Each structure stands twice: as C-alpha cells, then as structure tokens.
C-alpha cells in the first residue's frame, strides 16, 4: 500500500482523488474503523485523535470537526479560505436518513456561507453587484467540495464524493444559475425567501431569528442526487422526493 502524508492529500490533486477512492473502500464502516484505516494510509495522522478536540454533546457539527481533524489534520477554524487551500477544496460533512422503505436521502441542506441579513439589505451587496455567481465571495466555498456522508441512524460512513461545480452536468449547473438569479431578484425587491429555488437556495441561518441572517446552501434533493450519481446508485424521484437505494453486497457461497 502506498503511504501518504497530510501534505500529499492536501496539496496533490491526484493523491487527493486516490485518497477518497481509498476511503470509499470502507463504506459502511464505523468512524472508529474508518479512522483506523486512514491512519494506516497516512501514518502521520496517528497523533490526531478525537480527544484533542473539545466539543460539547450539543455541538451539531462535532462529527464534521472530528472528521476534518482525524482524516485531514485540520483543526476547526473560522478562516474564510477553503479547507484545503492549495487545491481550493472545501470539506463538508452531512448526514443521510434511512427512509421506511430502506432508501436514503439527505437529512438537511448543505450550508455554504452567510451572505447577508434581511435587517439590512445593503449586506447583500456581494450578490447584488455580481450577476455571475462565479464572481461572488462565497463561490470559492462551493466551487469544489469534498462531501463526506454519514448514516444518521448509526453514524456509519456512507461514502465520500468530490463535487466540482465546473464539471457538473449542464442541466444541474443551469438550475443552480437559475436559482442564483431568483435569489438576486428577491434581494432587489427586498422579498428574500427560499420559495421557488430548486437546488441552490437562500435560507435563515444562526440561532437568533431576529438577526435576519441569511446563508446560501444546497437543498436536500441536490445533495441526494449528486451523491447517488457519483456513487453509481439508482436515483428515484417521486414528486418532490428524491432518494436512492444502496445495492446489497453479494454473498459468495462455497
């Protein structure tokens, strides 16, 4: 097995891709087992343990912080740059829920970045001034995303996919652009809401509703669809619902 360093997986695009392929060999693993396998591939990470990070039980993003630290060697920070700056890649962790029929879909939206407050529409200046989404400040947080997906029910690893905006199917990219234009129009009319947006939407963010903070994020159906496509799972759409099944592993009998 080829051994990597933290620098390898954070700065070398080819090794980063191969590292994600390595992670996906352990779909269905507990996080503890995944960390163990990661440390075999990147021995330098043996000194990066969950106990190093102090988080409270109510911290909604604690799994994300643990994963980013134990798998990529990144400590939590408030820096606006992508998590892997050399590769311009943002690391996101989300959870998928199991439906009654045994299928899966995204439990919640994937927040990208705060963009302003409805208490002061001038705070949306970045969006108002940029007709092209690629020129916005938040675009660097969505251009390239490594999405790590966990099972909500048992916290096992469902897989990791790399989302490159520039390589999306034209239909997906067109819808995102349409959504962005809708968001800008609502800002212009001071009527911000997420109504009518399909993949990218503007939504309330933060604990204090009175602050009027809004963020942009990818909606559940987009996250579900992009993950399933990259994992080669069949996508099922019924009305507004989007979900997929994970094929059962074949058992060999001798």
Which role fits each region the language model picked out?
Residues 89:
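Conserved active-site neighborhood of enzyme catalytic/cofactor-binding cores
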Residues 1-84, 93-254:
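Nucleic-acid endonuclease domains
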